[in-house]
Amino acid sequence: MRPRKTKLGDFRPNLRGGPHQLTVNGDLPPSHFLLTLVHEIAHMKTHETFGLKVNPHGKEWQNTFAKCMEPIMEAKIYAPEIEAEVRRYLSKPKASCSADTRLLRALRAENEHSSPLLTLEEIEEGALFVLPGRKPMKRGKKRRTRYLCEELDSGRTFAVHPLAEVQLLKLKDERDFL
């Protein structure tokens, strides 16, 4: 599957009796790919068992996902630091492993060839940066799990994930953009 920025994988049931469609981004590191693949397989199994009557990431899916992960966890496929985070995550999995900062950090650490970009949490408050495909922004304070960042052109505020990859701007003054 070609790389996507918005989601790691996808399950689409065929409601007309044909085969289901399951996709996973092919550019994910192996541990992340495996977790995403099992996540989507759990959606398929949940759909086959319960149909459309259950929430996509409800209790039924969570239980199915944990069951699907059991043989993988028993086989000790993951590195110890990733395994510990996956076990913690499996106690109450979120809709995306990207929503679990600790798990995402462990999965990214495995990938030695990761992006040369910094993450938002690595830059100082007040620093200017650009998210890929966005306008210049200024990092603000952390609010619960995300950072409040101001887009310089519009003054709009966005809540940005701490592990979002950013390009730091080396400027003397933010007025260089205005």
Spans of features found by a protein language model:
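Metalloprotease/metallohydrolase-associated module, dominated by Zn2+-dependent proteases
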Residues: 1-15, 21, 27-30, 51-178
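Active-site recognition of the HExxH zinc-binding catalytic motif
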Residues: 35-48
